[in-house]
Amino acid sequence: MSKAWSGRFKEDTSKDVELFTESISFDKALAMYDLEQDFAHLEALLKAGVISKDSYENIKSGLKKIKQEIEKNEFYFDISKEDIHMNIESRLYELIGEDAKKLHTGRSRNDQVNTDLRLYLKDHILKIFELLKALKQQLVLKAKEYEDLIMPGYTHLQRAQPVLVAHYLLSFKEAFLRDSQRLIDAYRRIDTLTLGSGALAGADFPLDRFLEASILNFSKISRNSMDAVADRDFAIEYMFCLSSIAMHLSRMAEDFIIFNTEEFKFIDLPDSLCTGSSIMPQKKNPDVLELIRGKAGRVYANLINLMVNLKGLPMTYNRDLQEDKEPIFDATNTILNSLKMMILIIKDIRFRQNIEAGNLLLATDLANYLVEKNIPFREAHHIVGNIVAYAIENQKPLESLTKEELNNFSKAFDKDAKDIISKESSILRKKTYGSTNKDFVKKQIDLSSSEESIDKNL
């Protein structure tokens, strides 16, 4: 079968041009989605009376054969056929003959590829969604395991205040919950059928787009054919969702990399998820975490790639849009793999029971104690700042300071001041919902199961 557009041309396409313009090397990932669309379009052609029942049956049998070949990895993808659409159509012609030429009636590759891409994104959002759900569940399980363990919380990578390990882990669960919600929002906009828009002006045949939408499980159809074939907003939104996931994975990986060092010694990583050094026998390197962190930049770059591609395109379709798929496929596979790895890490990570919280983490508690003694917070802050300087100069932890020493800075300190200078007291003194107080953390753990109902909205 000659090229679909060869009638206009007197010369064969240069082999160099074929190699430069082909997309089958990567858009073969859309093969099954393209076939789904072919089956739906075939139904619309029959209903509109554009093809006969005999042609319909012939085409349908050929498409089923192609589907089997693809599923068995027996389909030959030919660069000379340009893209996935023409590869399938050419193979259909080989199988059934002239009827194959009728399938493309009433559509363009412009609306065809847009629909394929939406089908791909919907499918992969569901896959990513399930992995996010599994990751959140692992974080909750790990939080339950360490719901009594205290660690230092950080600002500016400086020890700040004591927090429960469970509270720390649940902070990431909240971030991934937002990622799940963003995916739901993106899914709703992706869930629009653009098939039937043609090259840009629509189809000349009375094709039932609502029938096609129903068959392909789209909740709505596009309203403007020009916008439909030009639109890649939905892909950008999807890519931002992936970038946000990558960011949260990277931040968590960064923490674990730091916490795993000899300088911190907060966590232990399983041998099965680490690698060694070719020269230093003692090394146990967190390579998986480092790659999760590194791959975040790759996902960001794919988002920027797509946005830069789109920024200067005139309406409507331009061949530049062929370049949307590789960044999307790469970012998708990167996120799928990174999520799988992080799930394994959370499942097997171990927090050490003897985490050293540090000597100065209770300074804020001392300041708040003075506030309870009717000293304005700014004044209390200054007083405790002087106490901290004294403790550092004399190499004393705050817990060891006597009432007499504290009274040198403020007579408001009573004997009960010693009761609050402990990590456990600091945790218990937190009174706001969402704080690291054990009761509130336990409520957050219990709420997590009900929040999974959000995950069923797709």
From Swiss-Prot:
It is an enzyme of class 4 (lyase). Its EC number is 4.3.2.1. It is found in: Cytoplasm. Pathway: Amino-acid biosynthesis; L-arginine biosynthesis; L-arginine from L-ornithine and carbamoyl phosphate: step 3/3. The keyword Amino-acid biosynthesis applies. GO terms for cellular component: cytosol. It holds the Pfam family ASL_C2. It catalyses: 2-(N(omega)-L-arginino)succinate = fumarate + L-arginine. GO terms for molecular function: argininosuccinate lyase activity. GO terms for biological process: arginine biosynthetic process via ornithine; L-arginine biosynthetic process. InterPro entries: Arg_succ_lyase_C, Argininosuccinate_lyase, Fumarase/histidase_N, Fumarate_lyase_CS, Fumarate_lyase_fam, Fumarate_lyase_N, L-Aspartase-like. Keywords: Amino-acid biosynthesis, Arginine biosynthesis, Cytoplasm, Lyase. Belongs to the lyase 1 family. Argininosuccinate lyase subfamily. This is Argininosuccinate lyase. It comes from Hydrogenobaculum sp. (strain Y04AAS1). The gene is argH.
